[in-house]
């Protein structure tokens, strides 16, 4: 591992789960190029993570999990994100759901306990399915087309969800849908994967995060129990963001893409130390211009490390940040990560864009940080409106 000014910030102690993540990182990283090339799903990574107890990282200790907070979870996601961000993204969505379950007064206790038990005992991942072909992301407003119809024997769910990260491995879906009641409600329903009428369409063929399995999930009159409502409310009641959801989503997404930039930085440093052009007679690392650019990368990653560390610690300490503050952290860290990898490409020219080297994969992956909700324009507009009082 390359040690630099912008090294990852370790906690004051090294918990066992951090050591386990570090142990798995090399194995996961070795698999990443093939899964990227083939756009195949890394099932074996999740078997390994389960065996090390890391799928239960954010499950409360009282329910048999590790009970990690945002700080340690961000550290694990940074480690796994550096190895394979597709795996880390699926993992982060699962972690977010369990943190929300543990802190929410709306999640039915019986359901959260059931999912916690399954996660402790095996590979039982969950993710929220929210994005739709027409609606796009619900973060920008609007009601979903996916509809849950109440019957005497259960809910009947119909609709289509796109960009369903982890679709090949998910055991549970938290589906964002509206009801057919006289007064429409909207919210999350817990739906087991694989029920009759459910199908996965393998539509994910992306520039980056190609192994994330973010396919389309279609529900065609899928029947599930009436007591599977997670949190369903009147549409206007959703105007205030969930603090836990918005905060940890920002932290975890930021940590993953910072990890990608660190993987790019490590490869770059080794390349510059070892590359000796014939007309120079010395490593590229000896050039002041190269040192300046690498120093700029170090500065961005050092800022990222401090932001993620302090923000996650604030969350763990009970300090409640606003959604705008959370979103600004995500914007800053992901854009720093993108710029760091762009600068690495600038220094390496054709070598950096060659499929024989990992830098082009890191670049494709890090660009995906900009498309995660909230997008940069929404964050800047919200911050600007608040500052201007409009």
For the regions a language model picked out, list residue spans one by one.
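Glycine-rich beta->alpha junctions and the first turn(s) of the following alpha-helix
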Residues: 206-300
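C-terminal helix-coil-helix/basic helical segment that borders enzyme active sites and/or dimer interfaces
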Residues: 33-36, 302-332, 345-353
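Glycine-rich flavin
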Residues: 43-51, 57-160, 165
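A short core secondary-structure module
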Residues: 160-200
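Generic structural signal for well-ordered, non-transmembrane alpha-helical segments
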Residues: 19, 259, 295, 299-302, ...
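Register-specific recognition of a single heptad position within extended alpha-helical repeats
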Residues: 8, 12-15, 252, 281, ...
């Amino acid at each position: 591992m390359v040690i630099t000014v912008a090294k990852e910030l370790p906690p004051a102690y090294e918990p066992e789960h951090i050591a386990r993540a570090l142990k798995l990182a090399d194995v996961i990283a070795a698999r990443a190029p093939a899964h990227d090339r083939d756009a195949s799903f890394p099932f074996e990574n999740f078997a390994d993570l389960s065996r090390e107890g890391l799928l239960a990282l954010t499950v409360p200790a009282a329910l048999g999990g590790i009970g990690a907070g945002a700080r340690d979870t961000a550290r694990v996601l940074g480690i796994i994100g550096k190895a394979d961000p597709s795996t880390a993204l699926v993992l982060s969505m699962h972690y977010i759901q369990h943190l929300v379950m543990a802190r929410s007064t709306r999640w039915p206790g019986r359901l959260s306990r059931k999912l916690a038990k399954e996660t402790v005992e095996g590979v039982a991942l969950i993710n929220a399915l929210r994005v739709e072909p027409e609606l796009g992301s619900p973060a920008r407003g609007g009601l979903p087309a996916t509809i849950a119809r109440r019957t005497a024997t259960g809910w009947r769910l119909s609709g289509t969800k796109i960009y369903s990260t982890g679709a090949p491995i998910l055991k549970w879906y938290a589906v964002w849908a509206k009801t057919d009641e006289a007064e429409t409600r909207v919210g999350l329903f817990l739906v087991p994967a694989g029920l009759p009428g459910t199908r996965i369409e393998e539509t994910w063929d992306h520039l980056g995060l190609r192994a994330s399995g973010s396919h389309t999930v279609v529900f065609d009159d899928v029947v599930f129990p009436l007591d599977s409502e997670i949190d369903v409310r009147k549409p206007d009641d959703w105007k205030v963001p969930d603090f836990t959801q918005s905060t940890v989503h920002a932290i975890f997404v930021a940590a993953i893409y910072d990890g990608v930039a660190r993987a790019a930085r490590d490869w770059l440093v080794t390349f510059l130390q070892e590359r000796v052009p014939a007309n120079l007679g010395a490593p590229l690392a000896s050039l002041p211009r190269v040192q300046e650019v690498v120093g700029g990368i170090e500065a961005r990653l050092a800022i990222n490390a401090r932001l993620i560390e302090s923000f996650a610690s604030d969350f763990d300490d009970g300090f409640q940040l606003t959604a705008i503050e959370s979103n600004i952290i995500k914007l800053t860290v992901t854009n720093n990560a993108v710029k760091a990898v762009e600068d690495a490409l600038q220094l390496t020219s054709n070598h950096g864009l060659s499929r024989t080297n990992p830098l082009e994969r890191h670049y494709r992956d890090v660009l995906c940080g900009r498309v995660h909700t909230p997008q940069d324009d929404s964050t800047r507009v919200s911050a600007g409106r608040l500052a201007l009082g409009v």
